[in-house]
C-alpha cells in the first residue's frame, strides 16, 4: 500500500521536489535530526532520574 502511494505521488513529482525543494529537504532533515537528538537526550535524562511515579507504566 505504502509503496504504491510512493509510486503514484513521488515518481511524477520527483524532479520537481529534487530541484525546487532540495534546500528545504536538507533543512527538514537537519530539523528532524535535532528533534531526535533532543528527544533521545530527554529520554536518557529521564531514565537517569528514575521512573516517574505519575506515569506508572514502568
UniProtKB/Swiss-Prot annotation:
<dbReference type="Pfam" id="PF08039">
    <property type="entry name" value="Mit_proteolip"/>
</dbReference>
<keyword id="KW-0496">Mitochondrion</keyword>
<protein>
    <recommendedName>
        <fullName>ATP synthase F(0) complex subunit j, mitochondrial</fullName>
    </recommendedName>
</protein>
<comment type="similarity">
    <text>Belongs to the small mitochondrial proteolipid family.</text>
</comment>
<comment type="subunit">
    <text>Component of the ATP synthase complex composed at least of ATP5F1A/subunit alpha, ATP5F1B/subunit beta, ATP5MC1/subunit c (homooctomer), MT-ATP6/subunit a, MT-ATP8/subunit 8, ATP5ME/subunit e, ATP5MF/subunit f, ATP5MG/subunit g, ATP5MK/subunit k, ATP5MJ/subunit j, ATP5F1C/subunit gamma, ATP5F1D/subunit delta, ATP5F1E/subunit epsilon, ATP5PF/subunit F6, ATP5PB/subunit b, ATP5PD/subunit d, ATP5PO/subunit OSCP.</text>
</comment>
<keyword id="KW-0472">Membrane</keyword>
<dbReference type="GO" id="GO:0005739">
    <property type="term" value="C:mitochondrion"/>
</dbReference>
<keyword id="KW-1133">Transmembrane helix</keyword>
<keyword id="KW-0812">Transmembrane</keyword>
<dbReference type="InterPro" id="IPR012574">
    <property type="entry name" value="ATP5MJ"/>
</dbReference>
<comment type="function">
    <text>Subunit j, of the mitochondrial membrane ATP synthase complex (F(1)F(0) ATP synthase or Complex V) that produces ATP from ADP in the presence of a proton gradient across the membrane which is generated by electron transport complexes of the respiratory chain. ATP synthase complex consist of a soluble F(1) head domain - the catalytic core - and a membrane F(1) domain - the membrane proton channel. These two domains are linked by a central stalk rotating inside the F(1) region and a stationary peripheral stalk.</text>
</comment>
<dbReference type="GO" id="GO:0045259">
    <property type="term" value="C:proton-transporting ATP synthase complex"/>
</dbReference>
<dbReference type="GO" id="GO:0001650">
    <property type="term" value="C:fibrillar center"/>
</dbReference>
<dbReference type="GO" id="GO:0031966">
    <property type="term" value="C:mitochondrial membrane"/>
</dbReference>
<feature type="transmembrane region" description="Helical">
    <location>
        <begin position="22"/>
        <end position="39"/>
    </location>
</feature>
Amino acid at each position: 500500500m505504502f509503496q504504491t502511494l510512493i509510486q503514484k505521488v513521488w515518481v511524477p513529482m520527483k524532479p520537481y521536489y529534487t530541484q525546487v525543494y532540495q534546500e528545504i529537504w536538507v533543512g527538514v532533515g537537519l530539523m528532524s535530526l535535532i528533534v531526535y537528538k533532543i528527544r533521545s537526550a530527554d529520554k536518557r535524562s529521564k531514565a537517569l532520574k528514575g521512573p516517574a511515579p505519575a506515569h506508572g507504566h514502568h
